[in-house]
Amino acid sequence: MRLEKSLVLIKPDAVERNLIGKILEVYEGAGLKIKAMEMKQINKEFAEKHYEEHRDKQFFNSLIKYITRSPLVALILEGEDAINKIRSLNGATNPEKAEFGTIRRRFALSGTENSVHASDSIESAEKEIKLWFPKVFYEEICG
C-alpha cells in the first residue's frame, strides 16, 4: 500500500465543544500522521468554493452558514490507505446511521453538524489540499 494524504476538517460544532483533542486522538491512534494543521475562520466565498459540488442542493445555504459560523481546524493527514481509513473512522455522514465508535456516532449533532469532513478520493484530496493549504501543495508538487 502507498501513503496517501487527505484533507480533514474538524468542523465548528466540534471546535465549539472542545473536541479537537479527542478527534485527533482517534486519527493518531489509527496510525495517521498530521502533516499540517491550522485553525481557520473561513468566509462565505471560501466555503462556497470548498462545497461547490453541493451548490444546487437544498441544504447548501445552511451548510455554508454552519461552516462559516465559527473557527474550524483544517489538517492534512497522511498514512497507508489514508482516505479509506479516515472515512471509516469518521463514519456515515448521518450520525444516526454511523457505526458505533466512529467519530460521527460519538460526537456529531446532526447530518449537517457532523463534526468532521474528509476527502472522499485521491482526486478530491488533491483539490481540497490545494485549496486549504496552497503552500504545502506547492512545496509537495514543485519541491
UniProtKB/Swiss-Prot annotation:
The keyword ATP-binding applies. GO terms for molecular function: ATP binding; metal ion binding; nucleoside diphosphate kinase activity. Pfam families: NDK (PF00334). Its EC number is 2.7.4.6. Its cofactor is Mg(2+). InterPro entries: NDK-like_dom (IPR034907), NDK-like_dom_sf (IPR036850), Nucleoside_diP_kinase (IPR001564), Nucleoside_diP_kinase_AS (IPR023005). One of its GO terms (biological process) is UTP biosynthetic process. It comes from the Bacteria. Keywords: ATP-binding, Cytoplasm, Kinase, Magnesium, Metal-binding, Nucleotide metabolism, Nucleotide-binding, Phosphoprotein, Transferase. It is an enzyme of class 2 (transferase). ATP binds at residues 11, 59, 87, 93, 104, 114. Transmembrane segments: none annotated. It is found in: Cytoplasm. One of its GO terms (cellular component) is cytoplasm. The keyword Magnesium applies. The active site is at 117 (pros-phosphohistidine intermediate). It catalyses: a 2'-deoxyribonucleoside 5'-diphosphate + ATP = a 2'-deoxyribonucleoside 5'-triphosphate + ADP; a ribonucleoside 5'-diphosphate + ATP = a ribonucleoside 5'-triphosphate + ADP. Major role in the synthesis of nucleoside triphosphates other than ATP. The ATP gamma phosphate is transferred to the NDP beta phosphate via a ping-pong mechanism, using a phosphorylated active-site intermediate. Belongs to the NDK family. HAMAP family: NDP_kinase. Homotetramer. This is Nucleoside diphosphate kinase. It comes from Clostridium perfringens (strain 13 / Type A).
